[in-house]
C-alpha cells in the first residue's frame, strides 16, 4: 500500500468518523424523546437540544481556523464544511420541531411568534443568514461565485453565530450560565481570528 493510498484511507475514515459523531446527538435525544425520557416538557426539551447542537456545530466550524493558527491543526479545516452543514441541519430540525411538534403547523400562531417574540425573530434571522451559506457550500458554487465573492458571502457566518447565541440567551428564562458559555467561546474564537488581521494591518503601515 502506497503512502498516498494510506492518506486517502485515513481521510475517508476521518470523514466517516466526523459524520457519525455529528449524528449521535440526534440519535441520542431522538431516542430519549420517543422513550419519554426528556422531562415534564419533552417537546420543549427536544427542540432546545436540537438548537443547542446546531449552535455547538456552528461554533465548532468557526474553531477550525483558530485551531490552525494556534496549534497548527489542519484536520478541523478539512472537516469544517461537513460540520458547518450539520450545524445548518440541526438548526433546520430545531425550526421544524418548533413548527410541527410545538405549534402543530399553526401558521398564524407561528407568524405571531416571529413578530412578537424577540428571541424567535432573532433565531429566524440567524437561520436566514445560514441559508445562502449552505446553498453555496459546494466546490462548484465556489467556482461560480469566484473565490473573493464566496469568501465575502461566507463571512455571514459571523453575524449568524452572534444572532444564534443571542437567540439562546433571550430564550432562556432563568439560568443564563450555558448561553454565557456559548457567548464566551464565540468571543474567544472571534478574537483569535482578529489578532492576525490587526497585526497584518499594523505591519503594513509605513512608519511616519
UniProtKB/Swiss-Prot annotation:
Q: Which gene codes for it?
A: msrQ
* Family of the protein in this entry: Belongs to the MsrQ family.
Localization: Cell inner membrane
Organism whose genome encodes this protein: Rhodospirillum rubrum (strain ATCC 11170 / ATH 1.1.1 / DSM 467 / LMG 4362 / NCIMB 8255 / S1)
InterPro entries the UniProt entry points to? Fe3_Rdtase_TM_dom (IPR013130), MsrQ-like (IPR022837)
Q: Where is the signal peptide?
A: none
Kindly state the subunit structure of this protein.
Heterodimer of a catalytic subunit (MsrP) and a heme-binding subunit (MsrQ).
Put simply, this protein is called Protein-methionine-sulfoxide reductase heme-binding subunit MsrQ
Swiss-Prot/TrEMBL GO biological process terms: protein repair
Entry note: cofactor = Binds 1 FMN per subunit.
Principal place of residence: membrane
Extract the HAMAP family matched here.
MsrQ
Keyword terms of this UniProt record:
Cell inner membrane, Cell membrane, Electron transport, Flavoprotein, FMN, Heme, Iron, Membrane, Metal-binding, Transmembrane, Transmembrane helix, Transport
Question: Record's superkingdom?
Answer: Bacteria
Amino acid at each position: 500500500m502506497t503512502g498516498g493510498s494510506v492518506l486517502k484511507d485515513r481521510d475517508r475514515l476521518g470523514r466517516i468518523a466526523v459524520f457519525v459523531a455529528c449524528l449521535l446527538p440526534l440519535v441520542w435525544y431522538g431516542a430519549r424523546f420517543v422513550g419519554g425520557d426528556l422531562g415534564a416538557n419533552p417537546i420543549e426539551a427536544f427542540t432546545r437540544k436540537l438548537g443547542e447542537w446546531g449552535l455547538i456545530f456552528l461554533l465548532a466550524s468557526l474553531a477550525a481556523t483558530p485551531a490552525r493558527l494556534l496549534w497548527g491543526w489542519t484536520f478541523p479545516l478539512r472537516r469544517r464544511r461537513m460540520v458547518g452543514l450539520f450545524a445548518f441541519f440541526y438548526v433546520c430540525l430545531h425550526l421544524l420541531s418548533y413548527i410541527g411538534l410545538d405549534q402543530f403547523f399553526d401558521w398564524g400562531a407561528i407568524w405571531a411568534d416571529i413578530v412578537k417574540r424577540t428571541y424567535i425573530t432573532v433565531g429566524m434571522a440567524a437561520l436566514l443568514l445560514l441559508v445562502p451559506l449552505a446553498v453555496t457550500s459546494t466546490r462548484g458554487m465556489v467556482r461560480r461565485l469566484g473565490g473573493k465573492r464566496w469568501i465575502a458571502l461566507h463571512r455571514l457566518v459571523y453575524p449568524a453565530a452572534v444572532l444564534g447565541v443571542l437567540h439562546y440567551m433571550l430564550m432562556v428564562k432563568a439560568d443564563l450560565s450555558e448561553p454565557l458559555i456559548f457567548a464566551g467561546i464565540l468571543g474567544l474564537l472571534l478574537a483569535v481570528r482578529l489578532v492576525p488581521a490587526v497585526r497584518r494591518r499594523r505591519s503594513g503601515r509605513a512608519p511616519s
